């Protein structure tokens, strides 16, 4: 016989062999357990016989010739008395047709044995009452049918075939033994859990002590901070001194530009009306480079001329000569520390050069000068003015400008310079949507301000809106055609859009505005305070156009008119 492929003659599939096995089995144990049992009618059911050989037929005749048939009913009664009746505990799904006709578990590759009639009948009354522990295979099937896996079910072993009646009492005794082992195992697990809880409690106690110690240390440090803070309270005069020290600190974090460098060949040097000439040149729309020479002559004649230094700084920043403009504006503030126009212009120049902290400190000085009550309330509300990181300083100054803007929120009384300062603060933190709102508000208040239109164009360009930026720059040049910085910004926008020919045209025009006429009528370019940004950007445009032959031709002192004629640009 083979457990892997049982045939018709195998004991697992032969009903007569199973009958004979039951009749010859020792039933002394069952007899001792059923002294009070009565014989009842046996309701054995046998299915149609299969073909038998001679040996099987002889076994059958021997069995049939016995005086009385083997009675299984008393044994079944005794089993019902020994084992708990699980019939009432069976779920309705288990009492259905599938429960009445259970199918033994079949392992793949192994033939499923045929089930005899008596075995089927016995399984109707006994096998459904025996608890088993499910295998992983049976658990998967239960879940797939929507049934929760039963606990303590032990699956059949397909190699042993259907459960035999003679093995039931042995299984009862084995189950009692297994229950005893289970109880011992459970007691052991409970003891282990108690030991783990004790160990955990022992570990938590030092941790709680550590937390308590840390809280005490924190309280002590906090008390020390409060005492130190109370001892270091500053008066208003001390606040003012600290504020000035703060400004000087941030102003010194940038590059030291030193003294302003004057142009050697200046046609206005000996003109006593150089300052007035410079004003007229700006009003008439002359080149900014010519006006710069006039203001240079004015401050050389009178180094204490505040307005001349201010005008010189404004002209040089608009002429795309940022460093020269910063030097002039700082000199102006040395002479007049509370000059509002110089403070705002210098703060914007600091932002352009990347000195953000110096710009924030300059804007803070601007608020303190124009809106002292706002600064005073801020000092009283927030005595800690020691924060020197970029973000904290920007936040502090931004709050000051917002409070100043709330004093005149709208209408003719709105301070456009407050909106400009707010826009610069937001611009430095790359918050371009807020920047646009501020500069647009400033333009609404003064629609003909070329500087405001140029700032709006820069914000639009950094917001990835080059078309709108070009419109803003174009409006700037309509208001001030000699605004070199606006032409430079316009050229950069054209490069970003791939319109290199237009970019080159505006950049060359900006360079041509640096040329001035000398006393003999010839054109020349200032040798001092030259702009490198225009030259470097023009080289980028030629590189993008694949005109490498022109890159080396672009250098300081370039004669733009001759360059255009020679290279047809």
Swiss-Prot record:
Residue interval(s) of motif WxxxF/Y motif 3:
243-247
Motif WxxxF/Y motif 1: where in chain: 118-122
Q: Where is this motif: WxxxF/Y motif 2?
A: 183-187
Alphabetized GO MF terms: peroxisome matrix targeting signal-1 binding
GO (cellular component) term, any one: peroxisomal membrane
> In residue terms, where are the TPR repeats?
272-305, 306-339, 340-377, 378-415, 416-449, 450-483, 484-517
| Main location (coarse class) | cytoplasm
Region span, Amphipathic helix 2 (AH2): 57-72
- What modifications follow translation? Monoubiquitinated at Cys-9 by PEX2 during PEX5 passage through the retrotranslocation channel: monoubiquitination acts as a signal for PEX5 extraction and is required for proper export from peroxisomes and recycling. When PEX5 recycling is compromised, polyubiquitinated at Lys-21 by PEX10 during its passage through the retrotranslocation channel, leading to its degradation.
Q: Where is this cross-link: Glycyl lysine isopeptide (Lys-Gly) (interchain with G-Cter in ubiquitin)?
A: 21
User: What residue spans carry the region label Amphipathic helix 4 (AH4)?
Assistant: 218-234
Where is the stretch described as Disordered? 23-42
Crosslinked positions (Glycyl cysteine thioester (Cys-Gly) (interchain with G-Cter in ubiquitin)): 9
Which Gene3D superfamilies does the record associate with it?
Answer: Tetratricopeptide repeat domain (1.25.40.10)
Which sequence ranges are marked TM in the entry? none
A biological process term (GO) from this entry? protein import into peroxisome matrix, docking
Question: Which UniProt key words apply to this protein?
Answer: Cytoplasm, Isopeptide bond, Peroxisome, Protein transport, Repeat, Thioester bond, TPR repeat, Translocation, Transport, Ubl conjugation
Region named Amphipathic helix 1 (AH1): 10-32
The family assignment reads: Belongs to the peroxisomal targeting signal receptor family.
Please give the subunit comment from the record: Interacts (via WxxxF/Y and LVxEF motifs) with PEX14; promoting translocation through the PEX13-PEX14 docking complex.
Let me see what the UniProt entry remarks about domains: The TPR repeats mediate interaction with proteins containing a C-terminal PTS1-type tripeptide peroxisomal targeting signal (SKL-type). The WxxxF/Y motifs mediate interaction with PEX14, promoting association with the PEX13-PEX14 docking complex.
Role this protein plays: Receptor that mediates peroxisomal import of proteins containing a C-terminal PTS1-type tripeptide peroxisomal targeting signal (SKL-type). Binds to cargo proteins containing a PTS1 peroxisomal targeting signal in the cytosol, and translocates them into the peroxisome matrix by passing through the PEX13-PEX14 docking complex along with cargo proteins. PEX5 receptor is then retrotranslocated into the cytosol, leading to release of bound cargo in the peroxisome matrix, and reset for a subsequent peroxisome import cycle.
Name the record gives this protein: Peroxisomal targeting signal receptor
């Amino acid at each position: 016989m083979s457990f892997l492929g049982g045939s018709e003659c195998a004991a697992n599939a032969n009903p007569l062999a199973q009958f004979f096995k039951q009749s010859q089995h020792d039933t002394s144990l069952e007899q001792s357990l059923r002294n009070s049992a009565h014989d009842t009618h046996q309701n054995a059911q046998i299915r149609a016989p299969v073909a038998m050989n001679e040996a099987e037929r002889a076994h059958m005749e021997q069995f049939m010739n016995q005086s009385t048939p083997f009675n299984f009913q008393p044994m079944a009664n005794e089993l019902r008395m020994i084992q708990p009746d699980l019939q009432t505990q069976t779920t309705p799904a288990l009492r259905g047709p599938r429960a009445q006709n259970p199918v033994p578990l079949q392992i793949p590759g192994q033939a499923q044995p045929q089930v005899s009639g008596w075995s089927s009948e016995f399984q109707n009354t006994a096998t459904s009452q025996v608890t088993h522990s499910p295998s992983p295979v049976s658990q998967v099937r239960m879940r797939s049918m929507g049934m929760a896996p039963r606990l303590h079910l032990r699956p059949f072993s397909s190699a042993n075939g259907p459960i035999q009646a003679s093995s039931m009492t042995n299984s009862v005794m084995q189950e009692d033994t297994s229950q005893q082992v289970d109880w011992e195992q459970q007691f052991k697990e409970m003891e282990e859990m108690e030991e783990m809880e004790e160990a955990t409690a022992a570990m938590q106690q030092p941790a709680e002590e550590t937390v308590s110690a840390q809280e005490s240390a924190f309280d002590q440090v906090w008390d020390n901070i409060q005492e130190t803070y109370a001892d270091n309270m500053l008066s208003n005069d001390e606040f003012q001194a600290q504020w000035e020290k703060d400004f000087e600190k941030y102003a010194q974090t940038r590059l030291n530009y030193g003294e302003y460098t004057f142009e050697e060949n200046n046609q206005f040097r000996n003109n006593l009306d150089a300052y007035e000439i410079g004003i007229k040149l700006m009003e008439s729309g002359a080149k900014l480079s010519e006006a710069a020479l006039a203001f240079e002559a004015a401050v050389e004649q009178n180094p204490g001329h505040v307005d001349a230094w201010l005008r010189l700084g404004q002209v040089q920043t608009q002429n795309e000569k940022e460093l020269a403009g910063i030097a002039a504006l700082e000199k102006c503030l040395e002479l007049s520390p509370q000059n509002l126009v110089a403070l705002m212009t210098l703060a914007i120049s600091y932002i352009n050069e990347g000195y953000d902290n110096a710009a924030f400190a300059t804007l803070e000085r601007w608020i303190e000068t124009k809106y002292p009550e706002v600064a005073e309330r801020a000092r009283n509300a927030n005595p800690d003015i020691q924060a020197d990181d970029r973000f904290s300083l920007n936040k502090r100054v931004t709050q000051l400008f917002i409070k100043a803007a709330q004093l005149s929120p709208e209408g003719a009384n709105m301070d456009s310079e407050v909106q400009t300062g707010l826009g610069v603060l937001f611009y430095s933190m790359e918050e371009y949507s807020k920047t646009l709102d501020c500069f647009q508000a400033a333009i609404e208040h003064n629609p003909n301000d070329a500087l405001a239109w140029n700032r709006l164009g820069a914000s639009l360009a950094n917001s990835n809106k080059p078309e709108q930026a070009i419109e803003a720059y174009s409006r700037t040049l309509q208001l001030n055609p000699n605004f070199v910085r606006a032409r430079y910004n316009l050229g950069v926008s054209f490069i970003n859009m791939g319109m290199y020919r237009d970019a080159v045209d505006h950049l060359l025009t900006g360079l041509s505005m640096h040329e001035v006429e000398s006393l003999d009528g010839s054109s020349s370019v200032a040798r001092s305070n030259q702009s490198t940004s225009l030259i470097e950007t023009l080289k980028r445009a030629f590189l993008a156009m694949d005109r490498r032959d022109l890159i080396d031709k672009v250098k300081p002192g370039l004669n733009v008119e001759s360059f255009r004629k020679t290279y047809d640009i």
